[in-house]
Amino acid sequence: KQRVELTPGIDVDAILNDVKQRFAGEQVTDIDGVKIDFADRWVHLRRSNTEPIIRVYAEAHTQAEADALGRELIDIIKASHA
């Protein structure tokens, strides 16, 4: 579990939509955030209702792979609202 700190007032829905479009070739679910299912791993992005953050949950075969997947999505999120 990781998180991305956001600037207050940022359009979180636009960020999540950007991520959703970027991974349109994968199985994407947009219930309670955005979940992207890859063949052997998944990542779930969920906005906080109490803080200006997006929580990033990832699962893969190893903790290192899950951490790397989480960092990849964090980099994408940061780039989309830079």
List where the protein language model places each region.
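Phosphate-binding and adjacent anionic-ligand microenvironments
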Residues: 1-82
